[in-house]
Amino acid sequence: MKERIVVAKFGGTSVADAGQVRKISDIVRSDPARRFIVVSAPGKRFSDDIKVTDLLLDLYERAKAGEPFAAELRQIKMRFREIIDGLGISFPLDEEFEILEQSLKTEPMRDYTASRGEYLTAKIVAKYLGFTFVDPAWCVCFDQDGHLNGPMTSRTMCASLLPLNRAVIAGFYGSDMSGVIHTFERGGSDITGSLAACAVGADLYENWTDVSGLYAADPRIVENPETVSYMSYRELRTLSYMGASVLHSDAVLSASELEIPINIRNTDRPEDAGTMIVRHLPSGVVKNPVTGVSGRKGMSVIQIEKVMVSDGSGFSALMLDILKERALPFEYCLTGIDSITLVIRKDLLDDCKEDLFEEIRETLHPDFIGLRENQSLIAVTGEKATESSDANVRVLEKLTSEGIEISTINQGAGKLNLLIGVPEERYEDAIRAIYEFRQSL
């Protein structure tokens, strides 16, 4: 029988100080299946604290500008010294920081500098646990443009990890064939954990953070929202992409391809079951038709009208080509008989909207082109809409009854999957209204 394998990733709050690292030790040792541990850089210890990665990025900027950085370097070193002393272990911190200092003096590199938080944390945690340290520069493979090479990473991670009994892997970064360090975007340690889980064929990928699972709504907007016990990979990807910050959406994709369950847990409350992310609900589990609601502000809605744009003229394709040539991503595109609606982040439009509109007029000759700014985009998702077939309609009715203007609607087929545009000033009202509707089901 195959030995059970669990990959456990611990986020920044879970390694913020020595006390948190001791909690990691208790969690890891409570289940022998937790063989492979992925860690982030130390996060905030209190609300006004600064994350180590932010300190490192500031350090890089000062070095790049030729400004003195000794004080900033000492501050970062002190963070790690406090963790080491608190754990009562010996660790060559001076040597590690001499290497970092030399790199900053000779050739400052942003990704290399930013990655040193995860690198040092993983070495310290490995030392404390008595596990083998694995540097992802050996096994997380990027190309020279900073894009992940998934197939090569899978092979090299498998070869690096499986022969080991137990290991700690630094999250967030890897390297290209020349040895140059590249990082994922912020939150990328989640991706490292998911890649490791796939490489070793894990039975479970645990993501340990500072909340006991994923909330059905943003707790900064809704007071004491319900924790979701089960949700699908699709639901989590939608909610994560639209602003739910517990897990990086790309991490979900890797695990879902091999149907590895993801369990979001709380380092401070390990007794809580958290949220389980699965392909299909276990038999007998009943869940709310509306799994959750999340969203993002800072959107603009472009409305383009021309008679019979859907008659095979290629109007929509030409519009998307314009965006592609400008490397201008969009959140979604909705095509009607006589119109196209595009939702694009406002900050991406600010410097180019006049030129963009002029190109649209010259290329497509629309009857009308309009712009709505200061919009927000809200995702409402659920897998059980077949049991409440009017859920989509009732969500919209709830918003209308609250006097909330709806600027755009994009509705998926079958399951509950709504993307709704509302003015930014009513964003929080809309989130609360949808959550209130959810709780009434």
Each predicted region: which residue ranges?
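Nucleotide/pyrophosphate-binding catalytic subdomain
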Residues: M1-H248, V252, R345, G421-P423
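Structural motif
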Residues: R4-V6, R34-I37, F131-T132, N165-V168, ...
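Positions that flank functional sites
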Residues: C139-C141, S212-G213, P270, D338, ...
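Acidic/polar loop patches that form or flank catalytic/metal-binding clefts of enzymes
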Residues: H248, E259-N266
